[in-house]
Amino acid sequence: MANSAQTDTVSAGNLFSYDSVALSDPSTHIRLLDLHPASCYTDDLYCCIYTAPISPPPSYIALSYVWGDSTRTHEISVANEVNDGRAFIPLRLTSSLDTCLRHLRELHYRRQLEPLPLWIDQICINQDDNEEKSFQVRLMRDIYSSAHQVVVWLGPAVDDSNRVMDALAEVGQEFLDKIGDHTEEEHWLSVDRLIKEKIEQPDAVTFLREAYKVIYMLNREHSFTRWVERTWFKRLWTIQEFCLCADTIFACGYKVVSQKMVSALTDFMRCIIMDKCLRGLLETPDTPTYSTLFSGLMRLFPLFQHRGYCQYPYRKETLEHLLVELFVGVTPPCVTNKRDKVYGLLGLAGDADELGIRPDYTTSTTLAQVFTQTARAIIQKNWKIQRKRGLQILRYGSLGQRKSAPKNETDLPSWVPEWNGRIAKTYQREMSFLACGEIRMPDLVPTTSPTILGLRGFCVGTIVDLGEQARVDIWRRSADGAKKIVGFFDNFRRLLNLSKQNKRAKDIYASTAHHDAALWRVPIGDQHIIFGVGRQIAKRTDSKEDSAFQNFIAYYEDYVRRDDDWKDYMAAYQAGEEQAKLKMGKHMDRVFSEGYYMGLRHMEGKRPYLTENGYLGMGPGLLQPGDKVVVFHGDDIPYVVRPVPGKGDNTYLLMGEAYCDGIMDGELADTAEREDFYLV
């Protein structure tokens, strides 16, 4: 076995050169390697490397794995034809790939002695040639979709992983046999439908109850949690690699399980969590609580959703949707090269060809250019197809989303998202705002630079006064949270009174009562949040929300008045007194049941504002007087922009999305004066 000390003695001149296996055309050809057999794990690694067209492809297995430490401390010997004989030249590998190849070699040669044909990015792409890498990454979708099989290598067997793999294989196969194949197109991840079809059969209920028990125990003992917390599940490139091939398997140590079995049990966990009736049928004294399933489900279910979209062409996700799903309001997947936040998703995006984005790793292209090109391509594509909400990507750009500083290290324009994992979700849920009125199509204005986005729209007003940021802070379990909530609404009442004193505001509100209702309507963006099946959805508020608000604010005002009582209560809670715990549970039930808290939580970090003409609303936390509230053609919510001194009257920084009371249904769309806005 070649160790790091041996590798260090090999001179650069004696190492494998990619020139010896040059690609005739890196846009149409790939390299493959045949891994040679060996008698035991510690035998040196040998292979031969050759080229092949990607179409039609030969038979090969594509590997999905994690590089780990990129230092190449190990080696594989590559066959080299010399004078009609054969010599072997070393090619350096990372430690993780060395371990992987030794396991795969042993797994393969337990069944047959033929060489194992593989595609592995670390070996088959010249990683030192950025131009070749750019062409080969463009082929990534074809490489993985054309493979005979994709092997997901999770790593050696540790942390009780053999038990997890055995359970997934055994219970997963039995699930497919007794309940049905949820991956068939007519079912497509519809385990709940398959269960409902079989639930009247006693043997099916018996099996499901036992399957629930097995999954429950793996989660309770954290074996499954440790399995899904392996590094492979946290990387971005692995999502694409996992989704593209029909035959995909997980390998962990010397255990192998089909993705289909893991998928079935993953969706079964979702059904248990979401379906109270099913839980009631399957629960036993051995499975007292379903909450233990959450950690495993949250890591796996999105992965299989992406795979489901990918396997059926008419369900393909757009690049915009993928970026939002993976980088907004969640812990984002990891990448080594930041431009792979885009390039690593192109193989999954159904609109990748239409967008015209081509991977480019050359030093002449900057990260800012990659992100700017991506945002502009998405906006222009949506404009072409007259898609409603075609400017939605602007919600994730803006200086309001830059949590570290207004200027970032990539020097992005203000309207381009960083996709850095600190992006907050848009406050808008699934509902019918339409601030742009009937002008559903983005109206792009030509500009002199790709970094400037020109949009046509109208100005609502200029901000003249501000309230405090919304901080829903009850989770700190101190009276400070209640004080902040009460203080926020006291300050907003001040803005409301100023609006009512503004004569121009009389044109905004149909009645005094409607104006008064802005007190509870504006802070939650006129949205009542409810829980749907597996997600949160929203509807427009109505008069019932007034009652919910009165209960909400009265509760927190009571906390503020009883500060000392609250401190005593929290001391009792922390000491574990049952009555205190019960009281906290009832408190949470009350807060959540009426929905006002959830609406306010979706506006977390936003700041109330008042315009010179009496409009009230919520905008990014870094607002300042002089900022403008605007609506762009083709978008259904307003934004806040900031004039750029010395750049002309129409040049602005995009500060972020906003809510503006009295315009969200297009009240100004027909009468407001049109302007051109240039975002830089």
Curated annotation (Swiss-Prot):
It comes from the Eukaryota. PANTHER family: ANKYRIN REPEAT DOMAIN-CONTAINING PROTEIN 39 HOMOLOG-RELATED (PTHR24148), HET DOMAIN PROTEIN (AFU_ORTHOLOGUE AFUA_8G01020) (PTHR24148:SF73). Involved in the non-self-recognition during asexual growth of N.crassa. This process involves restriction of heterokaryon formation via genetic differences at 11 het loci, including mating type. InterPro entries: HET, HetReg/Transcr_Mod. This is Heterokaryon incompatibility protein 6, OR allele. Pfam families: HET (PF06985). The gene is het-6.
